Every structure is written in structure tokens, then in C-alpha cells.
Amino acid sequence: MADAGQQRPLTAFAPPPPLWKHFTPDNLKKLDEIKKNASKGEDGKPQKKKWTPTELRALDVPPELHFLVPPEIPKSGHYSVFGELQSLSTALPSLQDQGITQLYPSPPTGDADREQPSEPSQPLNHAYYLLKISKSLLLNFLEFVGILSVAPEQFESKVEDLRNLFINAHHLLNLYRPHQARESLILMMEEQLSRTREEIQQMDKLKEEITGALEQLKKDGVDVDAAPIEAPDNDTKKPNVSEEKAIEDTRLVWELLDENN
């Protein structure tokens, strides 16, 4: 764990955490033995069991096996990915919280609504400000090209302006994510409802076809309301006249259904 506190050089691909060195074949075998002993039943034989991370953490394991047990999932705070801290909160942080200059007005908050309850708050027009930022990007890029042709050493300020414009544009696009999620869910529910309605229509259509086939059989003199003939206990017994008639009626029903389809 001493290596974790040392500063590592930045690389294109982050190195694995130091704890991977504990995942040796011997340690894995020891952990399997501990799980087998803990899962023994009354007969003394190990039982097949799917261990949850909570159950594994409750086992009495030696210190060298602690890294093999999944840690508890954090519910708050931050985690590090490629050397950058990421928040566990799903809320989109504002640009001011990230120390970035915001080039568009912030949406009205609840405090502003309570101060002026008679005036309804106007929602932020994302498309309008996205268009303005896009035009500013084109203008700043032209200025950047001009600076490179006249005084290339003065490019840093213009690059910072372009970077700030891109960050603001991406942040505005990310504000659409909740709306995109709602619309995607609505679309999925509408597709599911449409499939259910199609299945119901197919069932109603099949019901009408069967009803029409039965009505046609009644017109032909076939007694479709008669009780079905139970199959004989002896499979080798030959069918009698009534059984043959029932089989023939069934065959006629299927032929009529095939003709309608």
C-alpha cells in the first residue's frame, strides 16, 4: 500500500492498482478453501453456494486475502479514474462549481420563484444559446487562424477561449440528458403498448375465424356443441364410428382455418 501514496507519472493508459499482486493462485486457492469450509452443511459436506460480497466480507480471512474480497460499494464521495476524481452523484454539476466561466444565464431557481411569485419563470432556451456558442466558435476559430498567421506565440489566450466555448456547448447538451431519458422511456412504453395491441388484434382475428368456422360447420350439419370423445385407455383399440366422426369434424375445422388464412 506504500506505492499507492507515491505520485505516479501520467501515462496514456493507467497502470493497474497495486492490489492485483495479491491475486496469486495460492491466495485464490486459500480463499476457495475458506468458502468451502464456511458452506459446509449439517452432514459436513460443502454445499454449492453463490457468495454475495456482503457474505464474503463477513468471513474470517487472513490479511493477505483481504484484497480478494470485494469491498462495499460506496454510496457517496468520489472515486479516481485515470487520475481524475469522479463524483458518485448523478446530478450534473454547474460550470461555476467546476471553476469554469459560464457563457449563458443559469436557469431560474426556486428561491427566485418565491421572491416573485406573480411572474412565472421562463425556462432556459438551450437551442438559442447553443446556436450563439456555435457562431462564437466559428468566429474565434477564424481569429485563432489569424493570430497564427501574424503572431503565433500569442495563441494561448485564443485556445483558452475555444476550450471554454466547447465546454459550455457540451454542458448545454448534457442538460438535455434527463429529457432524452424521459423521451426514450416514453418511446419504449409506446412500442410495448403497440405490440400488445397488435397481439390483441391477432387474437381477436383468430377468434373471429374460429367462430366463423364453427358457424360454417353448424350450417353443414356438424354438431360442434357435442362433448368431446375421451381417448380410450387401450391404445391398440380401434376407433369406433363416433370417434372417427369427431376426428373428421376436427379435420374439417382445420381445413376451414387454413382456407381463411
From Swiss-Prot:
It is found in: Nucleus. Residues 1-56, 99-121, 223-244 are annotated as: Disordered. The keyword Transcription regulation applies. GO terms for biological process: regulation of transcription by RNA polymerase II. GO terms for cellular component: core mediator complex; mediator complex. Keywords: Activator, Nucleus, Transcription, Transcription regulation. Its main location: nucleus. One of its GO terms (molecular function) is transcription coregulator activity. Residues 23-46, 234-244 have a biased composition (Basic and acidic residues). Component of the Mediator complex, a coactivator involved in the regulated transcription of nearly all RNA polymerase II-dependent genes. Mediator functions as a bridge to convey information from gene-specific regulatory proteins to the basal RNA polymerase II transcription machinery. Mediator is recruited to promoters by direct interactions with regulatory proteins and serves as a scaffold for the assembly of a functional preinitiation complex with RNA polymerase II and the general transcription factors. Component of the Mediator complex. Belongs to the Mediator complex subunit 7 family. This is Mediator of RNA polymerase II transcription subunit 7. It comes from Aspergillus oryzae (strain ATCC 42149 / RIB 40) (Yellow koji mold).
